Amino acid sequence: QELWSDPLADMALKYGSNLAVRSREAMDRGISKYFPIDKLKCYFAVDTVYVQNKLKVLLCPYTHKNWDLRFQKGEPVAPKFDVNAPDLYIPTMAFLTYVLEAGLVYGTQDRFCPDVLWTRTNMALTWLLVEVLLITLGLYLAALRMPMDIPEIVAYAGYKYVGIVLSVLAGLLLGRCGYYVALLWNSCAFILFMIQTMRLKILPDMDVAGRAQSVSAGRLRMYLTVAIAAVQPLLMLWLSSDLVL
């Protein structure tokens, strides 16, 4: 009782509380700087209509005409308001489906064990991390003034799992020939999708009469766009070919 009535103790308690609050705020700011939790929520702001339309664009981009992103007050709108906006819902669901589908395939081939799913998940995540790091490095070397956010890069890189899942499913139902036909279609579709979306991120300054960048910088960005798109079929083949015998 005497301790709590002591002014010095009360002052120390208040100072400690204020220090804890300031430390927590500083830590939250530090975490938010590198891992913007609030911003991540926007990438999951989807609805059924968006998911349906996005899957159509991913699987048949040839009929999609307008690839421009929509903005409101200088900020991109949530995915559910713009089919061209990147999201993390579809890549996440596609990735989880890919892992479960791998388990199903291993089960039908009498190769299933719990460790197999863990190994498959680690392998896929490792390749995704490497891809994201390489794209980030490429964007840095291309000297982009407005580089893409990490969640955005993860979203675009993760869309490939939609095509992978459908290609493996075709292999299960139609055999290896069906797998390669489906993989060819999905790969071509994803190449076009990546070129159309990446050019809006990587080549925005090339439409401004070349004042903002040199010819060599513009060529580097064009090569980067093509390279990102061209490597996708190889990754899709690598991540799925062993699942179809």
What do these predicted ranges mean?
Residues 20-26, 104-106, 120-121, 162-163:
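Short, functional N-terminal and low-complexity linear motifs
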Residues 1-50, 56, 60:
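Terminal intrinsically disordered, low-complexity, charge-rich regions
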